[in-house]
């Protein structure tokens, strides 16, 4: 397993630790679905690119304060199956949180995660979860050192101009009567790097 050779700041690579199988490892929870449908993949990609374009064009009015300035340039994201597999293996462990090491031979990999739980007899759609990330823009001040990653880090990764690829995984399971939907998206190259701006202002 070549993933065991990939170096990260801490920990063992997710695919070295758990292998390449995306089989759910959720203890006594009842797994209802593991892995995104084609429609869910397309929805995630569409939502990301539409939002990136909105911000890049200077059409995002929200912020602290808004509006967000237009961007000089911003890549259009494409789906990457390797990033998606790493995300799916992690999601399949049913452990909410970031994994330690998910880089590929090509680049450092960033990550957004979301979990929605409901007592209703259905699972939250992926679109609601991605919207939670983009809605963090309301707390973001462009170019300020006061932004806290805990509050806006999902938004900043979503619109990180230099990121080119995305791949996601998910799991839907029932535990103690609650319907949990856990979504993991991996991004390459990673955003939220040091003091770099999320994008260059136009």
From Swiss-Prot:
Alphabetically list the UniProt keywords: Allergen, Disulfide bond, Glycation, Glycoprotein, Phosphoprotein, Secreted
**Keyword ATP-binding tagged:** no
Q: In which tissues is it expressed?
A: Expressed by the venom gland.
Q: What is this protein called?
A: Venom allergen 5
Its main localization is secreted
Q: Which Pfam families match?
A: CAP
Q: Read off the InterPro entries from this record.
A: Allrgn_V5/Tpx1_CS, CAP_dom, CAP_sf, CRISP-related, V5_allergen-like
Which Gene Ontology cellular component terms are annotated? extracellular region
Q: Does the keyword Cytoplasm apply?
A: no
The Phosphotyrosine modification is found at 107
Q: Which organism is it from?
A: Vespa velutina
- Sugar-bearing residue positions: 138
The UniProt family comment states: Belongs to the CRISP family.
Query: Subcellular localization, per the record?
Result: Secreted
Disulphide bridges, residue numbers: 4-16, 8-101, 26-94, 168-185
- State the protein's purpose: Does not show toxicity when intravenously injected into mice tail.
């Amino acid at each position: 397993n070549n993933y065991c050779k990939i170096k990260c700041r801490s920990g063992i690579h997710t695919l070295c630790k758990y292998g390449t199988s995306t089989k759910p490892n959720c203890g006594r929870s009842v797994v209802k679905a593991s892995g995104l449908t084609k429609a869910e993949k397309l929805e995630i990609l569409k939502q990301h690119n539409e939002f990136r374009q909105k911000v890049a064009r200077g059409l995002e009015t929200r912020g602290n304060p808004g509006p967000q300035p237009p961007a000089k340039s911003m890549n259009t994201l494409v789906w990457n199956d390797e990033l998606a597999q790493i995300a799916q293996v992690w999601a399949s462990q049913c452990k909410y949180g970031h994994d330690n090491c998910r880089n590929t031979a090509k680049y450092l990999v960033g990550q957004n995660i979301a979990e929605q739980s409901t007592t209703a007899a259905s699972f939250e759609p992926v679109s609601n979860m991605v919207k939670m990330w983009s809605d963090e823009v309301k707390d973001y001040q462009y170019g300020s050192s006061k932004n806290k990653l805990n509050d806006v880090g999902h938004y900043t990764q979503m619109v990180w101009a230099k990121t080119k690829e995305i791949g996601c995984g998910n799991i839907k399971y029932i535990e103690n009567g609650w319907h949990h939907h856990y979504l993991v998206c991996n991004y390459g190259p990673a955003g939220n790097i040091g003091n770099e701006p999320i994008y260059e202002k136009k």
